[in-house]
């Protein structure tokens, strides 16, 4: 870490008095804003000028002007004090309202976020996550929700949007089902019940990808949620086509196995999103950075 030396910093009260007086070009208005006397403002500015060894103001009768050096110094000090104020406000907000309200599609919450949430809690014990599952691809982002996970094409307007990952669709089956009826080549898919999620579209895309013109994609049960379809596959009710990220824990614990090197991209992806007026919210940005890095790390393993 870089070691910073603060030996030549002027007093904060002097900087505040200068910034306010320079903004108003008036000691009187600066005194009103800072709730002190005009004499106190004048004294603080004299201290600052003595510290810097330069004149910051030109005093002409009843008017006040900045010197050229004073103008340059004001621009920098104004920015610094604004950032100091914003940083303090963010910290106080975090202290008084530690909650982070997150909305996610139910399957993403069940399959990935909840199993990993303890990692975030260990890194940020001061932030209390409140998780809401929604029955739709796009998490619900409103005034009560700080941040959401969306599943889609990433074309949402007026939001901060970051893709979490680009995933392939995997053909998954239980080890028991594969032991009874192995899948060695694409033609073997015809011997199995197809499990669908929402629609038959993904199986149609896979059939086209594998050049299986006669695969009957209309047969087999259809589920509204991926976690239900994965459970059906675990219990040997057929083979399922699912996003790798959502099936990661089942693949890792061996309850489902991927068959055939499909390399078919999921046309949709998961995104972390929030409103543009929350770009400086430390809780939101901490969670965004954590989830992006966590998923990226899993991809590299």
From Swiss-Prot:
<dbReference type="InterPro" id="IPR000847">
    <property type="entry name" value="Tscrpt_reg_HTH_LysR"/>
</dbReference>
<comment type="function">
    <text>Not known, the gcv operon regulated by the E.coli homolog does not exist in H.influenzae, so it probably acts as a transcriptional regulator on some other operon.</text>
</comment>
<dbReference type="GO" id="GO:0005737">
    <property type="term" value="C:cytoplasm"/>
</dbReference>
<dbReference type="Pfam" id="PF03466">
    <property type="entry name" value="LysR_substrate"/>
</dbReference>
<dbReference type="InterPro" id="IPR036388">
    <property type="entry name" value="WH-like_DNA-bd_sf"/>
</dbReference>
<dbReference type="GO" id="GO:0003700">
    <property type="term" value="F:DNA-binding transcription factor activity"/>
</dbReference>
<dbReference type="InterPro" id="IPR036390">
    <property type="entry name" value="WH_DNA-bd_sf"/>
</dbReference>
<dbReference type="Pfam" id="PF00126">
    <property type="entry name" value="HTH_1"/>
</dbReference>
<keyword id="KW-0804">Transcription</keyword>
<keyword id="KW-0238">DNA-binding</keyword>
<protein>
    <recommendedName>
        <fullName>Glycine cleavage system transcriptional activator homolog</fullName>
    </recommendedName>
</protein>
<keyword id="KW-0963">Cytoplasm</keyword>
<dbReference type="InterPro" id="IPR005119">
    <property type="entry name" value="LysR_subst-bd"/>
</dbReference>
<dbReference type="GO" id="GO:0006351">
    <property type="term" value="P:DNA-templated transcription"/>
</dbReference>
<dbReference type="GO" id="GO:0043565">
    <property type="term" value="F:sequence-specific DNA binding"/>
</dbReference>
<feature type="domain" description="HTH lysR-type">
    <location>
        <begin position="10"/>
        <end position="67"/>
    </location>
</feature>
<comment type="similarity">
    <text>Belongs to the LysR transcriptional regulatory family.</text>
</comment>
<feature type="DNA-binding region" description="H-T-H motif">
    <location>
        <begin position="27"/>
        <end position="46"/>
    </location>
</feature>
<keyword id="KW-0805">Transcription regulation</keyword>
